[in-house]
Amino acid sequence: MEKEELNKLNHLSLVSNVCNELETHLGSAEKVLAEFIIDLGRHSETVDEFDKNLKEAGAEMPDYFVRSLLTTIHGIYPPKPKSEKKKEEGDDQKFKGLAIKDTKDKVKELEKEIEREAEERRREEDRNRDRDRRESGRDRDRDRNRDRDDRRDRHRDRERNRGDEEGEDRRSDRRHRERGRGDGGEGEDRRRDRRAKDEYVEEDKGGANEPELYQVYKGRVTRVMDAGCFVQFDKFRGKEGLVHVSQMATRRVDKAKEFVKRDMEVYVKVISISSDKYSLSMRDVDQNTGRDLIPLRKPSDEDDSSRSNPSYRTKDGQVTKTGISGIRIVEENDVAPSRRPLKKMSSPERWEAKQLIASGVLRVDEFPMYDEDGDGMLYQEEGAEEELEIEMNEDEPAFLQGQTRYSVDMSPVKIFKNPEGSLSRAAALQSALTKERREMREQQQRTMLDSIPKDLNRPWEDPMPETGERHLAQELRGVGLSAYDMPEWKKDAFGKTPTFGQRSKLSIQEQRESLPIYKLKKELIQAVHDNQVLVVIGETGSGKTTQVTQYLAEAGYTTKGKIGCTQPRRVAAMSVAKRVAEEFGCRLGEEVGYAIRFEDCTGPDTVIKYMTDGMLLREILIDENLSQYSVIMLDEAHERTIHTDVLFGLLKKLMKRRLDLRLIVTSATLDAEKFSGYFFNCNIFTIPGRTFPVEILYTKQPETDYLDAALITVLQIHLTEPEGDILVFLTGQEEIDSACQSLYERMKGLGKNVPELIILPVYSALPSEMQSRIFDPPPPGKRKVVVATNIAEASLTIDGIYYVVDPGFAKQNVYNPKQGLESLVITPISQASAKQRAGRAGRTGPGKCYRLYTESAYRNEMPPTSIPEIQRINLGMTTLTMKAMGINDLLSFDFMDPPQPQALISAMEQLYSLGALDEEGLLTKLGRKMAEFPLEPPLSKMLLASVDLGCSDEILTMIAMIQTGNIFYRPREKQAQADQKRAKFFQPEGDHLTLLAVYEAWKAKNFSGPWCFENFIQSRSLRRAQDVRKQLLSIMDKYKLDVVTAGKNFTKIRKAITAGFFFHGARKDPQEGYRTLVENQPVYIHPSSALFQRQPDWVIYHDLVMTTKEYMREVTVIDPKWLVELAPRFFKVSDPTKMSKRKRQERIEPLYDRYHEPNSWRLSKRRA
């Protein structure tokens, strides 16, 4: 009966929502119409089917509105599920691209081929190095000969001045002899070598009197600069060209002066001719023999060989060749264009310009398109860019026919158990309240800055200032000068001497013996010996992570190999390894070490290795049998990260091949049965925790503003409950900072008679010395409140917590395969997480947990366990890694919780567009190289494309800077000054080049820490970027990939970015902001971007961040032609004879009188 009533309420709620949507979009909200649409939606499985049914019923609606309606309807009435058997059969037939046969042999052949290529490049590099040494030796000989000739000339002059004829005859004879000796001194070998060189130099065909494109000529260096050198042709008197520093050698040359010097003889190749300017290359020519290393010829118009040759000429006459990244490289002039190309003006723009000129607002000669030689009218520049219309290339690859987004409806992951429940409404409301609070803070900041007097010198100039005026001016002068001026609550929390970890009076051995696991040491070792796979369950703080590895090392398991322990977080792997090294009695990096992405702190003696789960996955990629290890321990398995889930499947297979390998799976929650059932029904080893009873308290009514409710609860506990510390769970840094500020102000408002409350935040961006404060016990008579993210659920153990405040929310990364976007969404936690949070209050003594939601919401709106990461995030990196292991049959892979087939198809579609997969869905050579880099596939492609485009040095820096996160520090009290400092680094090309400018400026200041402090830049982030860059550089060196600089040619850099992130393209919307090219989604440039004031027509962004709007992060200006040029599988030029899809969806705003209402021009509809 209750279920029927609940269904009726859900139906009424759905009808109300549909009516509201219809009112908003169509201006009509009839209940009967809403009921009819809901019925159509209940019987439609896909968006296309729903759209078809609506059209048959006579309803024409926009695509986005149809999709929104169906999502709302399916939230209450999901499509009827088919039986499991039919579903599996259907998946095999429907998603054939996921059931390709495994090809491990082909992948191994690819690896050998890549190694052979690297070895060939290594040998070539050695040959070039030897040749450079020989050439430098010849240069020294040539200089010595020139000096000797100069001395002889001076000697001749002295003899000539004597003036006797006899001496003249003798001198004449001597000159002949000396000339003979000089010739002999040069040597017959030298002459033979010179003749051999000349054989390779192209002879003058038809008596050409000017240098020709792609021909090799001998020349002499006339002028040397840092950025390059000028070379004069020996053959053409008075003709010279520029050799840019990037074209001097295959290796990196920082300054031209280090490689060439004046009057040095060189061989050059003409790579570009512009008017009378010649761009030359030395690296394409063997300087020892004059041979062209990369021969390119000028094909005739009738030549059809471009189809079969790797290098060919495009329609506009540019020669291209295919690089290692699969893109066509256009041979361009290295000199940056002198000005931006003009965009073709539309008719309204020309009319507007003429009106401005006619009215006298704009001077005609200042207008860029003014015709000086003509009649003074505006002209359209020849060759001005036509407006390019680009659309998606909907051609599906053979292995994905009928499976991509163009054929199958890809719905987003359902993360809310009940989308209409109280928790869902509270999550949505909190996002709006956060936006409101942020805007209020910004308004207060602006008001404060506006109140500062503009002329602060007046009080000193005034001989009789008002009382206190000079003092006020002195204070105002200091506003904005201190870079890291913390708010009051942070000063109280962290302003004193920092501490570095939890202090204990016990010795290390006594601390180890006090852990609950110590009593079960013998039983645990025996259980590992008797079971190949063992699931270990124990509360956080029981000693699983730090002690199990040491017990096994003491039991002799390190004699057969290493003991590896994975952690889901980088920080955990580092801190745990440091602690275990102290207990083990060694230095970190010796017997005990750790490995995280871009950092390896291990050595040849390492026997206990802590690492992130992603690092172990990369080790399996190299050695599928993990032959170095005797024991693998998957710690914190209950967090179910994407790497852990893939490791489950790979290790399950490996256990059958390696019977000597031991696998331990640990978890802090009570979902052990699921793990045990997955791993061959293995035994479960339980460590009893030292927990006390916890009283659970629910709210009687749902809380709309959970943040405010949490603060009220904290104050209530502080004022009415016995002593004991408080732990509050919130969703992120912004929420935590806002809560701490508000709580501090409320405590100040209560007066000095109230006991002090120490407020301590915890989130990942906080420095470690500040995080460690939470472990210190508060002074007598005081209480501390720790405001933390869900990192305090299981990863941290804080003693002294008696009270837990749980609003019931966390932020989760959710991927939408239809839009191809990831976003951080506030979602209700699972019941397992709620139990875990409550358990934090029972570590020291009996405690209380205040759940800020109803018991009904706990039972009906929270899922039993969290949705695994593999079912809600982008699977591009995971799919590429599995393909690199030869695993193509992803449907049959033994996942504990299989991901959505649509998400896997979306990932494979992305990899195909990047060139990592071929037409059959198998890994390409480019894909295997991409898998070598510990980067997301787009970043890997961007790096490999930069090698071809000749800008890998800059792209390495950019990727390293992006990987470290936000490098700019913007304190709330000094936002204006921080923004001003940041603006100094802005580049007109975009944010990627701004990051490059920051790193180069830091490098120019010798990596100075004080310089970072002055410019509001986080020095820790820059040092991290430096380490990341070194790691990527070592991988580049391993495969002998060229690291070259593009100098000032930013076009190459922007092209490389486009080659990796073409699907993150956006175009300026005529009405407001931008529209993404893939889903036509409205997005905006963030106010902190270098391009915020410029608003270019076409951009590429790194990712999207949802705050008050959907903002693009790290934005760069692009040319739309590059999208088709660099991603022909993804984009194509629209058919000029047809109206494009974008133009069909574009809304045209009619002109209207600005002094009246926009719709006042419309005629009223006549009534019949």
Curated annotation (Swiss-Prot):
It is found in: Nucleus. InterPro entries: DEAD-box_helicase_OB_fold (IPR011709), DEAD/DEAH_box_helicase_dom (IPR011545), DHX8/Prp22_DEXHc (IPR044762), DHX8_GH2-like (IPR049588), DNA/RNA_helicase_DEAH_CS (IPR002464), HA2_WH (IPR048333), Helicase-assoc_dom (IPR007502), Helicase_ATP-bd (IPR014001). One of its GO terms (biological process) is mRNA splicing, via spliceosome. A motif (DEAH box) lies at residues 635-638. The keyword Nucleotide-binding applies. GO terms for molecular function: ATP binding; ATP hydrolysis activity; mRNA binding; RNA helicase activity. Residues 706-886 form the Helicase C-terminal domain. SMART domains: DEXDc (SM00487), HA2 (SM00847), HELICc (SM00490), S1 (SM00316). It catalyses: ATP + H2O = ADP + phosphate + H(+). Keywords: ATP-binding, Helicase, Hydrolase, mRNA processing, mRNA splicing, Nucleotide-binding, Nucleus, Phosphoprotein, Spliceosome. Gene3D superfamilies: 1.20.120.1080, Nucleic acid-binding proteins, P-loop containing nucleotide triphosphate hydrolases. Residues 76-206, 289-326 are annotated as: Disordered. Signal peptide: none annotated. It comes from the Eukaryota. Residues 214-283 form the S1 motif domain. It holds the Pfam family DEAD. GO terms for cellular component: mitochondrion; plasmodesma; spliceosomal complex. Its EC number is 3.6.4.13. Residues 525-688 form the Helicase ATP-binding domain. The modification Phosphoserine is found at residue 411. ATP binds at residues 538-545. The keyword Nucleus applies. Belongs to the DEAD box helicase family. DEAH subfamily. PRP22 sub-subfamily. May be involved in pre-mRNA splicing. This is Probable pre-mRNA-splicing factor ATP-dependent RNA helicase DEAH5.
